[in-house]
């Protein structure tokens, strides 16, 4: 299944290793080469439809998590390759697809040269651990955004720096900061130059973010091609300061005693595949135990978990 780990679906055996690699005791380390024996291969194929309404748009394929690597073909043509078990791989497949039925094929290996960089204390599985999605976006869209909130030295007022990167067809970008009730706190419209632009908001006495008062704002980013809005992206924003002064951890100027835990992206049934319900259960149990800080293992966890 997708998502699903091979070893939990009848293909191969799960391996737990603290220090070392999954082939420890059977094969010698020879980076960047990995053993051929027991390096299982998974092949995936399925058809999908591209609606006519997607004509003229950029079409992206996103694979949320593929262990240990993934080769991608669409309609018999090679699209690309990625290796990083805990980061999403995104491919622009616009020129590979056609309206109507299309064929996608993936090939994955249990181990790759990237496996040498993923030697951490956890269960070793292979497969697709997160969702696979197709997205159609207007030619005028947001490429990247960097948001930097900073409190002043008195932990009272704040600035919010927003830096955007866009495709060439974008003529303007509208920025709107809203409070928890949806009210407009600040807004600005900028014209990117060379696909880049930025602005710094001055925010007077914002509600602060902390573990006890998780106040969040929402930044709306509306992209326009000069004829109308082509894309709107929202991002939660929290205003806080984290620092160490005189060997004391301070959040918004106040001392905090960390009661933390390490959270691996690991499910007793799904392995690396962790459902939203299980994530919420984890959070509920941690709150019951008065845990106020979480280390999200050695890897990037799925985005929806901290959200």
Question: Model regions: which residues?
Answer:
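N-terminal carbohydrate-binding accessory modules
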Residues: 146, 220-288
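Beta-strand-rich binding/interaction modules
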Residues: 72-74, 157-191, 197-199
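Aromatic sugar-binding surface patches on proteins
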Residues: 87-89, 194-203
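Accessory carbohydrate-binding/adhesion or oligomerization-edge regions at the termini
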Residues: 1-22, 103-111, 180
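Surface beta-strand/loop "capping" patches
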Residues: 139-168
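Extracellular recognition modules
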Residues: 105-107, 218-222
């Amino acid at each position: 299944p997708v998502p699903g780990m091979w070893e939990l679906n009848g293909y191969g055996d799960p391996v737990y290793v603290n220090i070392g690699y999954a082939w420890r005791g059977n094969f010698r380390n020879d980076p960047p080469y990995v053993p051929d024996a027991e390096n299982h291969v998974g092949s995936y194929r399925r058809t999908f439809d591209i609606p006519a309404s997607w004509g003229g748009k950029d079409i992206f394929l996103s694979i949320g998590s593929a262990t240990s690597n993934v080769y991608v073909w669409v309609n018999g043509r090679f699209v690309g390759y990625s290796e990083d078990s805990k980061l999403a791989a995104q491919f622009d497949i616009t020129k590979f697809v056609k309206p109507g039925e299309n064929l996608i094929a993936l090939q994955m290996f249990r181990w790759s040269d990237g496996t040498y960089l993923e030697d951490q204390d956890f269960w070793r599985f292979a497969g697709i651990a997160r969702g696979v999605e197709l997205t159609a976006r207007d030619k005028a869209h947001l490429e990247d955004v960097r948001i930097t909130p900073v409190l002043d030295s008195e932990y009272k007022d704040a600035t919010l720096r927003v830096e955007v990167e866009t495709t060439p067809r974008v003529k303007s970008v509208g920025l709107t900061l809203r409070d928890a009730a949806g009210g407009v706190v600040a807004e600005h419209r900028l014209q990117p130059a060379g696909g880049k632009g930025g602005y710094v908001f001055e925010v007077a006495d914002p509600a602060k973010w902390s573990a006890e008062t998780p106040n969040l704002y929402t930044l709306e980013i509306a992209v326009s091609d000069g004829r109308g809005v082509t894309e709107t992206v929202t991002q939660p924003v929290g205003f806080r300061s984290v620092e160490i002064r005189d060997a004391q951890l301070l959040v918004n100027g106040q001392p905090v005693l960390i009661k933390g835990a390490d959270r691996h992206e690991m499910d007793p049934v799904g392995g690396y595949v962790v459902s939203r319900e299980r994530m919420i259960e984890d959070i509920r149990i941690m709150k019951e135990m008065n845990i106020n800080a979480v280390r999200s293992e050695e890897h990037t966890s799925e985005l929806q978990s901290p959200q």
